[in-house]
Each structure stands twice: as C-alpha cells, then as structure tokens.
Amino acid sequence: MTFSVTILTIFPEMFPGFLNYSLAGKALEKKIWNLEIVNIRSFAKDKHSTVDDVPYGGGAGMVMRPDVIGNAVDNVLSAHKNTRFIYMTPSGTKFNQRIAKELTEIPHVTILCGRFEGVDQRVIDVYTPYELSIGDYILSGGEPAAMVVLDACIRLLPGVVNNFDSVAEESFSYSGGILEYPQYTRPEQWSRYKVPEVLLSGNHRKISDWRREQSYVRTKERRPELLNGDDK
C-alpha cells in the first residue's frame, strides 16, 4: 500500500522541501509514498487571489477565509473520500511516535497548513479535522510542521529504512515508548573516552540488559512523564 499525502498550502513551492532528500526522497522516487500539492490560492475568487481577511472583533494579524479554505478542502475530499483530514495548529494534540505509526496505517492523509493567525473557526467546526501540534511554540506557518509529521511517518513505512530493527529500537519506539539507549561506534577509544566494556563483550544478553537499563535511566532523568504514561 502506498502512503498518499495531499498538502493544502498557499506556498506550494515549499514542498517537498527536505522530504526530497535522504530516506524520504528515495522513498518518494520508489513510490513508497506519493505527494500531491494543492495551492489554496487557486480557489480564491478575486483577481488578487486573496485568502485572508481582518478578524471580526478586532485584533492583530489576518485570518484565513472560510470560503476559500472550504472550496479547497471540498475539492480534495471529493477526490479522496477516505482521507484523514489534519490541520496543523499549536492548539492541537501534541504529535508523537504513536500518532506517526497510526497515520502510516491510513491509505491517504490530507494536511491543511495554516498561515497568519490561522483559519476561520468555522472551517474547524464544519470539517472537524484532526488538529495536530508538533510542540508548544509558534512557527510562521503549518508547512514546516507538516514536513516534520511526514518525515516521522515516512521512515516507518516498510522499505524506507533498510534495517527496520533500528527503527524499532529508537526513542519512543523502544521498550514501551521510552528513550533510546546511548550509541557508540569506532574508534574504541577517542581521546580519554572508551566505549563501555559491556558493548565489547560479545555477550548479547548482558548488552541487552545494559541497554534496557540505560534507556530507563535516561528516560527517568530527561522525560520521567514517559514512564508514567503521561505523554500518551
């Protein structure tokens, strides 16, 4: 099954961006996933292709118009009946590895990238998109956030990462969703620092136990909420 994505944006030239490189780019070439870009401005009705207007009630910034957004969304939904409609917004559910995995199991995903002060609330009320956030900070628009979500999803698709065990052992995927253990490679000694002896022992059980312990310690120190399930 190909993972298909439609992006709604006023800056179509931003895509595929960094998704055209490395693992995601190779997967795009192999058609493991595909990308459709819809320019929201093409659904505007005036000669200036206006997509925003001043907010009712006053306030700073501009708001994306519901009539223009609605026409663009209707166009996509009519072509993709079973799509999962997502809106990138700081007020959405915080994106995590579990959500990334869930999205890869859906054949088609549509992502609306907001700009300015966001979209008119009526768009949210009518289409009830899955509102997603990548963190508690503000970007200039939803496009970078959408790329982050897609990058996390694409690398989970079969055939993208050659050694799929490396994906399964990463942070948030490893041992119940906790942080990954520390990694080491050659040289065995760098400056005054040596690789932990257990990793050189060849004893796979001891190595596995060490990694599990290191993951737990690292998670307890840096992200204790993951141990309590508070970040689900």
UniProtKB/Swiss-Prot annotation:
Record's subcellular location: Cytoplasm
GO cellular component, as recorded: cytosol
Span of the signal peptide: none
Keywords: Cytoplasm, Methyltransferase, S-adenosyl-L-methionine, Transferase, tRNA processing
E.C. number(s) listed in UniProt: 2.1.1.228
InterPro entries, A to Z: Alpha/beta_knot_MTases, tRNA_m1G_MeTrfase_C_sf, tRNA_m1G_MeTrfase_TrmD, tRNA_m1G_MTases_N, tRNA_MeTrfase_TRMD/TRM10
Catalysed reactions, as listed in the record: guanosine(37) in tRNA + S-adenosyl-L-methionine = N(1)-methylguanosine(37) in tRNA + S-adenosyl-L-homocysteine + H(+)
EC supergroup of this enzyme: transferase
Chain residues that bind S-adenosyl-L-methionine: G114, I134, G135, D136, Y137, I138, L139
GO terms assigned for molecular function: tRNA (guanine(37)-N1)-methyltransferase activity
Domain of life: Bacteria
A Pfam family: tRNA_m1G_MT
GO biological process: tRNA N1-guanine methylation
Subunit structure as annotated in this protein's UniProt entry: Homodimer.
Family per record: Belongs to the RNA methyltransferase TrmD family.
Biological role stated in the UniProt entry: Specifically methylates guanosine-37 in various tRNAs.
Designated name of the protein: tRNA (guanine-N(1)-)-methyltransferase
Gene source species: Wolbachia pipientis subsp. Culex pipiens (strain wPip)
Lineage: Bacteria, Pseudomonadati, Pseudomonadota, Alphaproteobacteria, Rickettsiales
Gene designation per UniProt: trmD
